[in-house]
Structures are given as structure tokens and as C-alpha cells.
Amino acid sequence: MRSPLVLWTGFVLAFATLSYSVRFTEGKPPKNFLYRWSTFEGNLIQFAIIAAIVYGIGGLGDRRRLLALRRPTSWSTGVRIGAGIAVGMIVLTYTLGLVLKPGREQGVTPDTWQPDHAVAYVANGIVIAVVAPIVEELLFRGLGYSLLVRFGRWPAILLVGVSFALAHGLVQAFPFLAAFGAGLAYLRSRVDSVYPGMVVHGLFNAIALTVAVSGKPQAGILHACAAAWPALSPF
């Protein structure tokens, strides 16, 4: 029987390789990417496959323990850490945002609101703000952290952050994604659960999607998301 750590590492590296290959060969997705029903269908299939792989690897051990599917040890600790993640992302945005353009590089969010395609945009938004955070938190902060913590808490946090960033296949956004991923891993390590991270992650994506079509510059999306976390998150 293969080690769950070997299988997880192999999957993350393969996914990262695929993400960067697609990015460098095909470039950015079209601006109407989130207004398409085909995007909704494709993303659902993708996350279903990832979830099945996570479920399968987790089944090689104590699945609920590996995925950290349990009640957080402390809600108040989650509040403080959530605020800390917000402050950290604000600082990172101010220091690196002028040089790096993470939102522009990813190119997923549209520049304008198209009411004729509102239903498709909302459907894609549900996938990005609900399905994606659940699956990604289970993959990285659940399974990944549980398998890597044997090497130490901080190495696990850093490795989870880096692997999370690599999986997105971006260059300029890499520092932001790695910091966000590591912050969520730290949150998971402190509250011993993936549930608070799912909420923070979901809020981040939801606010980004909302800000993208509100007329505000995309360069400020990360700033807006980070500033809103403490007020909106129940954790």
C-alpha cells in the first residue's frame, strides 16, 4: 500500500505542473469566463474529481482525523487569527501590490457586470465561493497539513502555503497565494479544524467576485477582501 503522503505529494505536484502548463501555453482565460455555463460545468467536474481523490487518499488512514472534519477547539482563537490574516494580507497588498498584479495575472474575474449573464455568473460564483473553498481546504489544510505535520508544525504550515500557491499555476500572485495558504494552515493548526478556514476562504473568494463587477479597480480586490474578513466572518 502506498503512503498517503506520497500520493498527496504526487497529486499536488501533478496538478501544479498541469496548472503552469496551461497558463504558459494558453494564457489568461477570456474575460467572459465566469459568464459561461461551460465554466460552471467544467469547474464542478474538476472539483468533484479532486474531492474524490482527497476522499480516496484520506481513506488510507483515519479519514475524519486526516481531513480535520471536527469542531474547532476555540472560536475566539479563530476570530483573532482571522483578524491577523486580514491585517497580514493588507500589509502584503500595500507592499507588493504596486509591483505585482495578482488579479490582473489570474484574469478570471470580469471587468464589467453583464446582467444578461447574471445567472451563470452567480452559479459560477457559488462554485468558487462555496465548492472550491471546501474542496481546497480539505486537500491542503485538511489532508495536506495532517500528512506534513510529522515534519513539524511550522514546516507543515509553510509547505502547505507553497503547495497551495503552486496549485494555482500563477507567478505574480504566488507570494499572495502562499501567504494566504500559510495563514489558513496556521488557523487550522490552532483550532484543529478545517471549518473556520473554509469560511474565511469562501468569504475571500465571494468578496473578490463581488468587487470585480462593482466598478472598483481589480488591484484593490485583495485589500477589500482582507479588510472585510473581520466584519463578515463568524469565526
Ranges and model annotations:
Residues 18-20, 157-167, 171-232:
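Functionally important transmembrane alpha-helices
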Residues 3-61:
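Alpha-helical transmembrane segments in multi-pass membrane proteins
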Residues 45-50, 124-128, 176-184:
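Hydrophobic core segments of transmembrane alpha-helices in multi-pass, intramembrane catalytic enzymes
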Residues 14-19, 46-50, 85-93, 204, ...:
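Alpha-helical transmembrane segments of multipass membrane proteins
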